[in-house]
Amino acid sequence: MSSTMEQYEQRTGGEFATAIDLAHLSRQTLGDRTLEREVLELFRRQARILLFRFEAVTCPSERAQIAHTLKGSARGVGAGRVAYAADELERAANAGEPTGKALAEVAEAVAEATSAIELRFGFDR
């Protein structure tokens, strides 16, 4: 392997490893790499859709449910930062508190995770 390729894999692998807990993902998929790819592609799509849905609704209970769904999805694939941020967003929505700051954190965490997934697997944005 060329040194350029090694550097690329180290850079993207490190970014992926911070966004997705690889050991957790492997346990969830029983080590099946094809299933890992499929699950991550579903998460990537769903996370973006849920962000748009959250912004589109105004009812606090609906917003909390959307955040809860994202939290569960993130936990399933090992996207810890997304799960933590979604938990904070769910809490704020349930409490009727402003959600702007929590939503910005979720959006940033989702962007980090989805970018890492796209880099690792070459998915189109």
Question: Where do the language-model regions lie?
Answer:
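Two-component system phosphorelay core
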Residues: 1-125
